[in-house]
A protein has these predicted regions:
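Feature captures the catalytic ectodomains and active-site-proximal regions of enzymes
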Residues: 1-259
């Protein structure tokens, strides 16, 4: 059976929020069924587009040139995760609640790109998108799926990190993750992460509250209940390529966590 990967990113989800959330699934899943860390390291600036560009291209923002949420085409071509997988004839699906991620890969790399915008539907966007993603995984068993949820970050900017509204959003994320894990066919590995954390109603600094993220790795090649000290956001794309049996580009800075 060919290995497959589901990457789940919950925007702005702090590790201490995972520990304190009313909905227990994500917390218990990480602790009992994953190799994980509560001390993952984001990149500076700790802002969504720079962070996710760094995740997918395994380089720091100074190399890919995106320093805020306005996309800038890199001056030097760096193949991203979607692009490398497409070149290796892998089927990529992308589910997102934020339109600004539209330039994450080159045209043609995605078999499907589904957008359900938070600014139109609110937290219902996450619920609808999760249902669509779950249906596609069951029906198609794609090689790689990226599910991006922006609800937690949007709520935090409005009401504040670690407040009751934010914690409710983290619980919703936990419920959606449980739904996605529940439909996975045999052979899937899962990577769960955040792009950054946050403090008060903002983020983007080097404060631990902004830079520290949870990361969980689930699947047949990961030890259950093993806690790692530190994982960089830059290591996730190389790890996913390694799981899927694809060569890691030389220009990437991160390393596979399977090494």
């Amino acid at each position: 059976m060919n290995p497959k990967v589901l990457l789940i990113l919950i925007d702005g989800m702090r590790p201490d929020a995972v520990l304190q959330a009313e909905h227990p699934f994500l917390r218990e899943f990480m602790r009992t069924r994953c190799t994980y860390t509560l001390n993952g390291r984001s990149v500076m600036p700790s802002i969504t587009l720079p962070c996710i560009m760094s995740l997918f291209h395994s380089v720091t923002p100074d190399r890919h040139g995106n320093l805020d949420n306005m996309y800038v085409r890199p001056s030097h071509r760096i193949d991203g995760l979607f692009d490398v997988l497409y070149a290796n004839k892998k089927k990529n699906l992308f589910y997102r609640t934020w339109n600004e991620l539209r330039d994450l890969c080159r045209p043609g790399a995605l078999a499907r790109d589904e957008l359900c915008e938070w600014k139109v539907y609110g937290n219902a966007a996450d619920i609808q998108l999760c249902d669509r993603c779950a249906q596609a995984i069951r029906a198609e068993e794609p090689d790689f799926v990226f599910y991006y949820s922006g609800n937690t970050d949007e709520v935090a900017h409005k009401h504040g990190w670690m407040g009751p509204e934010y914690m409710e959003a983290v619980s919703l994320a936990s419920r959606n993750i449980e739904k996605l894990i529940g439909v996975l066919p045999e052979g899937y590995s899962v990577v769960i992460t955040a792009d950054h954390g946050g403090h008060a109603r903002s983020h983007g600094t080097e404060m631990p509250e902004d830079m520290t993220i949870p990361i969980a790795l689930y699947g047949p090649r990961w030890e259950k209940g093993k806690e790692l000290e530190t994982i960089s956001l830059l290591d996730l794309a190389p790890t996913i390529l390694d799981i899927l049996g694809c060569e890691i580009p030389d220009e990437w800075d991160g390393v596979s966590l399977l090494d």
